[in-house]
């Protein structure tokens, strides 16, 4: 069972709960998906059962078509946020990590075409592999100007920087809190840069953010 932990692997005293995500938050990714830039952030939720440890081998579905990787900056919430100001958001951020928003792309395409919600494509079991978190007070970089990259079998597929986000981290979380109360232990995913693509059994992935790297593989 997944538990929040720091980058070194020590358990953190936060409950595991929901993941609130934003789609279409990088212009180049929007272009590669053939989508239009939304007027407001596109939000969706992954349940607790979507979370798994990025350090462990990834179990992906085999019965629903292609499974795509999307590397994202993850934000750990450390206090309740409801109708929050940006000042409250800054104080409530407990840490930063990196996550994969695994996506059943064929399923998502059908649901988009039918005008239906994305949950089946985005919120399935183990769809959110998550790293350990670096405490906000110890994060030496700028979370809003942090590099993100993902390589598969030594080939770089995704490379971006959080500086390119359309909706920046703090105002984005404040916006989320207008609709969903965020509690300590909740995680926010902030969108993916371009270069998303399919995963296959046996693939080895290296995920990097702000100079920190993790390697995992697909079962």
From Swiss-Prot:
Sorted UniProt keywords: Isomerase, Metal-binding
Residues the record lists as binding Mg(2+): 70, 72, 101
GO terms (BP aspect): oxaloacetate metabolic process
EC number: 5.3.2.2
The keyword Magnesium is assigned to this record: no
Co-factor requirement: a divalent metal cation
Protein name as catalogued: Oxaloacetate tautomerase YcgM
Native source organism of the sequence: Escherichia coli (strain K12)
Gene behind this protein: ycgM
